[in-house]
Structure formats: structure tokens, C-alpha cells
């Protein structure tokens, strides 16, 4: 039997056709979010605080130290933050201690104080100095006096110690030490929810991880086409700080030519590499000794003006380098040296990070450069014992042992340079033969010792880099591939937040130093020394404005999960879309098991936005690792799983997971397809080091949800993976008959399901709560009920356990949207026939049966949120009311007494949801008006209707209303709102959308299409047994697209449906052809799954048998209700006066260049003229035409389009005068509209321009026709020079 029955959970079991039995269970799929944020909270913040504290004042007399810090409880719960549109955050507090040390001269002459009574003198002086009378003397020890100053009973008292140094006749010379401590607020910090998201202003946001170039040393070479010489390059790149770029010169030509070595410091002008070493205080002789008189360095030193006096040489080189970096500036030798040291060796300015140090040690240590080389000297230990003999060749077999010896820092030499340069002062030096065959000439390798751990650059790093570069021409070392994942690292949420926190503290650090310098330290409070605003501002800016902080894609659980696992190469410090070439976008061999080669966007971001593979993890240095099982002597060690980076992997031979093996893990094949150093390799069993853990480890979660992925063309699989994320949650979710086995894990880790937090027994279940009893006691889970997602879909959770069930930790106890019994269910299983139907499925269109609509198979629920703010304006307070001027009772029929729509009301476009009036400027009332006002009250008030109405396409049923009133003395239970807002009202309107013509659907194989026709059930073709077909797809959509997976899916789906089974066929290891034939035979299917279909309209059978089966189809979020749009009169662009575009702007359809060609081809001159003038931007013409139509008059002649005026003004701007000449040769004016034709009335933030000289005052304009334009206030004020009256 080729399958086994697998129990997915308590409710679901499937036939599992998995071939590789040793599949590793998947890691936590959102671990890249939750684990790194946990690191940030526990270690990341501490690291940054350790960098900045203690803070010293400029003069060194005061020091601010950090005693401890921590988060306090969040002020709001996650649910409250979402409902009130707030941030889910927690305050950070730190306990700080300020120590001040000062020398003071204290005068003895105080009125009424005995000069001999020192204690009284000191107490009196302290009272004056601190302005505080609560001073308590604690004790005296010889000449030291100890005092306590109480500020508040709730706070710790300040301690002051006064040591008398000298007792003069009229004064005391004292050393005063002040110790203040207190709790300081460092700001509110957003917290991550359990689902890996942040709640920012009520919306769920995700911080996307960024894939960037790792700090480290990189080497390259290229041919100079002019001279034919090879140029070698080396870059030392930090995470933050100065770049060092080395390159060899190529001016001298010939086999004997030796070119010098140059360096650029931070993109400045070139200087010789040796001048930098001389500037560090390494003498010329030491340089030559370290490098064994290397010919390139000898040549380079000749470029430096060296006279032999160390001090003078050092001074000249330091100043020379300073001039190159700071062009046009001069400095003393000491100043220049200090500057160079500060930009390279100061931790604050130069940050290599742990990852950078790891990469430098990996690249520049000798053990990684000597493979396939012959050692040219005995390698000795400290006692001169030979560890590795001369002439030993380093091979794959002995490299591990030699590496262990070199790790003991043998053959290291001490470096002599300036004492004020920090860092490791040892390098390793070993000689090897330039040519392993001839063994004549030797070259020395300088490498880092194992003890180098600094997170800044050291002189040892610079010497090792120079050595590496000099030896590249002897093929010692290798050129770097920048696109290799060993050279790119992931900045996860934790690191990105840590960087922001560091920037915030950097600003606080500057402010604190200024405060310590300017404040009276006797009176200052610890709690006021730090102002947290710079930190909270930077954090807020990051969450609200950063390219990496994204509004979470929440169409369905899969899109949410994918968003959290996304990697982007864009963003600050990354690439830009325009500059990224093909190489960086391409699939690289090192992506295997780390980044999915299939799931990436189509379009300008292709290859720049990627997704983590299923098993991939990010290690402590930010490099992506993937798991492999160890293989020893041809036997797979199932219990030894190792996570390797791309760099570690390249030295091993790795087999694919689908090898033949026995029950003990012994590999049965003799020759195995494997990978070595990024290439395919046919290996013998005994050569294998590792084996993949699973065939699906190379693809992402979404891609591994495509059954028969191996039978689909990659382009279509890419579309399939992307479209699964766009599937709308349906009201009756149905898990796929043909699944891949990832559905349970994807649903569990998405954050939308409710997962048991511990082993427990279910005590109570209803539609809103589940109560369990476990080790930690009674636990209540609250379920969401018709909550709105970020994308307007409905988030509803439904329980799948019953009272008395025993649940395990990590088990799904309530389904979220698009889930069925704990499995991801983003579509429906429908009967599909591949046949044409009267041309209705031309070009991928889909013909559907009405039965699907009636049964609500593809019906989805969508919730729209409409918000109304009640403000306090200059004219007075806005008001929510039912009394709205000039509104009929019919229009107000849905409003209650307060002016708010009732829950459950069915509303249409234009209906009022909330009535609101805004006061206009109050005018002096005449006696008659006052009388009317007294009689009728509200109705005659001078107010404007500003009600909230249902926009186009927003009809539905009012589901809920939320009101948030501002916190005030009268309303202490209110919430914090901006100063001018009194109340916020949110109305939620729910729509039930059945599937209809124009909606987009797809399968999981990139087979997408638009519904073109929904046929009555009786007209649909049906099988001979009467089973009606649900969907007809065009068979021509398969061969050229090469997504054959869909054909295999319909056959397997049909067979499984007939057998009443559900199946699992994982990617790359699912059913093969033979097994598919077996299950089809078991289900009684013949003729390769093709059947005779009967035409529903004629009752006749079709001529040829047709492929019919069950396919999992998805309804995508591109629905015709959101796209359909019409316009009659609407807004116009301010400059060209042409109608705006797009549905959001209520714009028109563009009649573009190609459409103009069509009319030109027909010779339709009058139609064309009309379209280009009165239907577009002939301002007067379009008003006159509207008037003519309304009054049934003749359509006037078109005038001059505004675009022509814009063009003529642009030509005038170039200095050409343009005018028109009539038939007689006379100049005539071009009729352009004049700004006098416009009156401007200021309406809040928008300005209404009304044309046709309509006069506007505070009263409503009574005009039969008017042309309205909504534009931005600033634009118009800039465009027309308005004086104050007009404005």
C-alpha cells in the first residue's frame, strides 16, 4: 500500500502519500517575528543601554548611571487598542543614579550662625544652595559630613557628603558629593501580540525583515581592458561607519610590472595603503618584515615620501591622510591622528556588529585560505614543538585537523603601533608556496587570531585584508559573490527596533550632557534629567512611516502568515527598485532551503521581495540557515539535525531527501544526486556528509500548498502561490480534498486560529467563549465575531471542540476565517469540466453553474468601516443631531432620535449614517430673524450639513456602531482623543457578496480567469449519472501554460471524492503516475478520467469524452463590485483642468493616445474634437454645453482646451511669444479663461471653485448648473495670488 492513514486532528483523517518518512516537524512559522522581538525585549534594549550608560558630563564632574530598567504593564489590552484605534504599548521605566563631585568654597559669615559651629554653617549653606529646608544631618566621620535631603515622601531622599579639605579663617574649602536617584520614564514602546503583529492606531502592522549586505571584508577582481592588467579590489564594510576600499593600480604594463596598492577612506581620494599603516605608527621596516618584503608593498612605499625619521614620517602621513578625507582643511599631527582613530576605532562611530566580526574572522583567518596549498614552513607551538611539518599539503581530508591546530593561535606575531589605538595586537603568520607543484617561491599569509572579538575594526584586520589582497594573484583565497546568502544577512524585527532605540538614546545622550552642563545640579531632579520625547518620536516615526512597517495583508490566514515571513531587499540601507540589476533578483544556488525560488511578486519588485522557505531559520548573526541530517558512512543519523548557513554548506556534499533507504537509515543507492559548492554532483554513498530533511524545504509555505507543484511550470506556480494569498474567506469554508499536508501548520501559526496554550479539559463552549481547565487553572478564550480585518474581510472564529474534550498544547480549538476543522480552507472543491462552451470561456473566462450561487459556495462577507469625527471648530462646536437643514424626513428615515443609524438597517448609496451639523460663521441677526430663531429654534440656525453618508458601492446592513467620547472632567470614563475632537463615531456596514459575472477566480496552479457567464442549472452539461458540472474551464488554457498539475489534481480529486476520502500529496514527494492510476481504478474511473458529458440544453451527449474532475477553486479579492465605476460630473485636475482618473477620485475613463488613433482611423473629426474639448478641458465650453443640454438648446462650438493654454504658457516660459493670427493676418487674443471667472469660498480643508461667475456669499448658491472642483487648499493658494480678502 503506497499510503498510510494520517490523523490530522480529532476531526480529520486523510490518506497520506508522503514518501520521505523522516520529515522533520516544521518550526514555529512566525518565530522570525516573535523570537526576535523577545530577544529585543530581554537583551537588545540592555545592549543599547550598556553602550550609553554611564553618561558623563562634559567636564567629567557628574555621572549618570543606570541601576535597572523594565517594562510595566500595558495600559490597554490588545482588544481595547484595536477598538479605540490606539497603540498596544507598555511604558519603559529606568532607575537612574546621578553622582556629582564638586569643589566648593563655603563662606562662614552667616547672620546668626556661630562660625565655629561647622555643622550649622554647612546646613545653612545647603539650605541656600538647594532651596530646600528638609535637610537632615545623618552622621560625621572625621572631616566628612553626611546629609539627607527629602524632596517628597514617596521619593528616595538625596544624599550629600561634604569633605572639608581646608579650614580657612573666613571659609571652608570642601569637596561636595551629591547622590540623587529616582525612576525615569523612557517612553511607551509598542508591544508585539502573540500573533507576531503590532497594533498601531488600531490597525495590525507587521515589521518585515530586511535582507541586506552583511558587514565584513569583500574581495573582487576585474580586467582593465586598456592595459590588460588584472585589478584587485578589497572593501571592508561596517554596519555603521567608515568604509575602507583597497585597489591595485594598473598603469604599469608588462609581465614584470609591479603596481602599487591604494586605499580610499570613506569614498575620499586615493592614498597609498602603506601611508595608512605608517599613520597607525607602524614603521617602514616593520611593514616590510611583517609582509616578508612583498614587492607590491616595496613599490607602494616608494610612492610615500619617507625620509627615515619615524616621527617626521608619521607626522607627514597622518596629515596627508587627513587632507584627503577632509579636503581643504588642515590640522596638527596629533589632531589628525585623533580624527583618524576616532572614525575607525571608536565604538560609537564605527560598528562592525557581531555578524561583521564573525564574517571577518571567517574570511581573514588563515585556515580558510590554505585549502589545496602546501605549507612552506614547520608550524610550531609555544614550546617550538612541530605541530604541522613543512611541505604538508592541505586537502579536504586533513583541513579539519589543521584548522583545530591553527585555532590555538600558533605562529602569531605581536604588532607594534600607536598605544592609543585599541584592539587585538596579534596576527597569525604562515608561509605557503605560491605554486604547489613547483614549491620554489613562498608567500606569507597574515591572518586574524582566534581571540579577535572586537566589534570595531583593528589594525590586525587591516593587515590581514592587505595580505589577502596581495595573495589573490597567486590564487590564494577567493573572490566573493555578493549575491550568495553567506554574504547577505537578515535584519529581523528585533535588530531593526534595536537600531531605532539606539538612535533615540543617541539624541537623549546629547540632551542629558547639555542639561548636566547647564542645570543647577543641587536643585535638579533625576526624573527631569531625561526627556523621553526624542526616543518616542523616533519609535513612532518608525512604526508609522518606515518602509519596513507594513499594514498587514489580512485577506486570509495564509496572506497574514506570508507577510510575517517576508524578506525584502528594499528599504533604508537596502537596494532601490530602479538600481537593482538582474543578478540580485535572480535565484541563487545558496537560496536552496533558505529562500523560496518561486514565491515572489510579479512586476518591478520581482526577486527583491522574497519569502523564507518552510524550514529556514535565522541564526544569531542574521544569516539564514536550513536543516540537514548528518550522514555517517552512508547511514542517515535521524537524531542529528544541524542548521547550516550558505558558507558552511559549501564545503559539504549534501544528498537529496528522496534517496532509497532501509528502516535503519542506510542509503541503498550506490550513486546519489547531490550538491557540492552550489553545483550538482553525482556522489558515492561514502562521500555524503549531509542529507536534506524534507523535499519541501526548498519552497515557502504558500508554494508548498500547491499539489503536484513538480508538474507545473515555475511561472505559473509563482502565480498560484501569490493568488492563494488573495483568496477571500468564504462563509462556508471547505478544506481541499487534495491537500499537501501543510494546511494544519499554516492555520495554527497564522495567528487567526485559537490554539490551546496548555493541556486541558474543555469545560464550556459557546460561539463567543471557550473555557478550559488545565494545570494553570481555569483559562478563558474569547472568540472574534464579525470583526473587520485590515482588508475589509470578516474575522469570525468558531469552536471545533466540545465540552469534555481533552485538548493538547498547540492544538487548534477554534477555527479562524478560511479554516475548516483546524485546516486552512481558502476555497471550495467543485466539479470542473475542461471543455469549450459557445465561446463563453474564450481567453481563460469561466462558465459557472447557478447552483454554486444558490448554495452560497463562494459567498463572502465584507465589512466596511465609516468614521465620523465631531470637532470643536472656530465657529463653534459640531453636533450629532437628527435636525439637519434642508433634509427631508424620507432621507432621515434610518436615523434615531440622536441622529445615528439603527443597527440592522439596510442602507443604500447616499443614505445618511450619522447626521452632523457644523456651525457657519455667525452673522448679526435682524429682529425678524431673531423672532424666527426664538420660535423655530434649531431649524433656522446658521449651520451646514456635514453628515456621514454611504459612499458608492458601500450599500449593506449596519452591523455595529462604536462611539468614543473624549476624556474630560465631565466624562472621566472617556478615551484620549486629539485636542479638537469631541467624539468619534464608527459605523460598520456588512455586505454579503455572492459570486457574480466579473469576479476573478483561480485554482492553485496559476490558472486564473474571470466569470463570464452564470448558467441556469438545467443548461449546464452533466454526467451520465445526472451529476451536474459546477464550472467549465477552457482546455486551451493548459498546454501553453504547462501547468499540468491541475489535470492531475482533478483526476485525484474525483477519485478521492468517489471514495469519500481526503488525501495528502506533498510537493516533490506525492503521488506518482502509478499510484494515481491505482486510486482512479479503485474509484472505478476509466478512460484516464475522461467521461461522456450530456449537453443540458439539447440532452445530446457531446461528441468526444471530456476530462471532468474535482478542483479546489478560489474566489480572489478582485471583485467586480469594487472595480465597477461610472462618472457624470466630478473633480478636475487643477492645472490641466482635465477630469481626474481612478475610482477613488470619482474620476473618468482616460481617452488616451491609442483611442485617439482609432477615431482618426475612422476619420471621425467632429467626435474627436468634441472629446478633446467640451468633454474634457474646454472650461467655458463644457459649462455652456451642460446648459445647452439642460435647456434643450443647440450645442455650442468648442472653445480652446485648457491644455493648450498650459502648453502656450510653458512655451512663453522658454522665451517664445505666442499669439494667434486670424484670416486677415491680424493678431487676435487667445480666448483663455481668466481667474476672475472664479470665486473662492473656504470650506474647512477643501476649497470649492465654482465657475461661470456664480456669486458666492454665506448663503447657499442657487444655480441651475455649476462646475465643482475639489482641490487641495495649498495648491490653489499657490496657483492664484490671492490677497487677504479673497483668501
Curated annotation (Swiss-Prot):
Q: What is this protein called?
A: DNA-directed RNA polymerase subunit beta
Organism, scientific name: Mycoplasma capricolum subsp. capricolum (strain California kid / ATCC 27343 / NCTC 10154)
| GO terms for MF | DNA binding; DNA-directed RNA polymerase activity; ribonucleoside binding
Supply the Gene3D superfamilies for this chain. 2.40.50.100, 2.40.50.150, 3.90.1100.10, DNA-directed RNA polymerase, beta subunit, external 1 domain, DNA-directed RNA polymerase, subunit 2, domain 6, RNA polymerase alpha subunit dimerisation domain, RNA polymerase Rpb2, domain 2
EC assignment: 2.7.7.6
Sorted alphabetically, the keyword list is:
DNA-directed RNA polymerase, Nucleotidyltransferase, Transcription, Transferase
The subunit structure is: The RNAP catalytic core consists of 2 alpha, 1 beta, 1 beta' and 1 omega subunit. When a sigma factor is associated with the core the holoenzyme is formed, which can initiate transcription.
Record GO cellular component, one term: DNA-directed RNA polymerase complex
Q: Which PANTHER family does the protein's record reference?
A: DNA-DIRECTED RNA POLYMERASE I SUBUNIT 2
Q: Name one GO biological process term.
A: DNA-templated transcription
Under the heading InterPro entries, the entry gives: DNA-dir_RNA_pol_bsu_ext_1_sf (IPR042107), DNA-dir_RNA_pol_bsu_external_1 (IPR019462), DNA-dir_RNA_pol_su2 (IPR015712), DNA-dir_RNAP_su2_dom (IPR007120), DNA-dir_RNAP_su2_hyb_sf (IPR037033), RNA_pol_bsu_bac (IPR010243), RNA_pol_bsu_CS (IPR007121), RNA_pol_bsu_protrusion (IPR007644)
> What's the encoding gene here?
rpoB
UniProt-listed HAMAP family: RNApol_bact_RpoB (MF_01321)
Q: What does it catalyze?
A: RNA(n) + a ribonucleoside 5'-triphosphate = RNA(n+1) + diphosphate
Q: Which family does it belong to?
A: Belongs to the RNA polymerase beta chain family.
Briefly, what is this protein's role? DNA-dependent RNA polymerase catalyzes the transcription of DNA into RNA using the four ribonucleoside triphosphates as substrates.
